[in-house]
């Protein structure tokens, strides 16, 4: 079995990692990283899976692909590296977080505290070329992340937070008899006022976890980003 991640995700995703299609993706990415500026750093590609093992995952916040500007992407959806200005979508997430559960905004965008509590911060596509949003869409990452979503869905008792049309296109992969889906508009400035603000995803998530008999997420981030 190939050990790309270093925890139980390697076993869960083994059929994908051992496939010819994944080998093609691996060859493509090797060339991309050698010839272009690709984000995140190759050692951070699987950070979301490394920080949140399969057995511990109780929430999924699904993004599209990584931030495509320098010093932003860190392998977790919506999260940015410490010391990086907050992207507009994350500012809006923090605003809703405060309005929903009273979590005090912080001046960094490093979301590791959530990941450590079982929140899988998953992008559907795990790499992106500099300045080219969706530049690696359709290159093969979807088979990995779709397999992860399906495996979690089959296990059950997961809350899937799906913001925007792209994330909601994954709903057919999720068994809604065994899991909870929380959906709204995307927190982007282009759509936040059309249903994201006021959607209360964080309190609704914790209410669903309580129904599952699982511990709620403490959404309050630390004032200083953790290393």
Swiss-Prot record:
The active site is at residue 65. Keywords: Cytoplasm, DNA damage, DNA repair, Hydrolase. It catalyses: Hydrolyzes single-stranded DNA or mismatched double-stranded DNA and polynucleotides, releasing free uracil. One of its GO terms (biological process) is base-excision repair, AP site formation via deaminated base removal. It is an enzyme of class 3 (hydrolase). One of its GO terms (cellular component) is cytoplasm. It is found in: Cytoplasm. It comes from the Bacteria. Its EC number is 3.2.2.27. Pfam families: UDG (PF03167). InterPro entries: UDG_fam1, Ura-DNA_Glyclase_AS, Uracil-DNA_glycosylase-like, Uracil-DNA_glycosylase-like_sf. One of its GO terms (molecular function) is uracil DNA N-glycosylase activity. CDD domains: UDG-F1-like (cd10027). Gene3D superfamilies: Uracil-DNA glycosylase-like domain (3.40.470.10). Its main location: cytoplasm. Excises uracil residues from the DNA which can arise as a result of misincorporation of dUMP residues by DNA polymerase or due to deamination of cytosine. Belongs to the uracil-DNA glycosylase (UDG) superfamily. UNG family. This is Uracil-DNA glycosylase. The gene is ung.
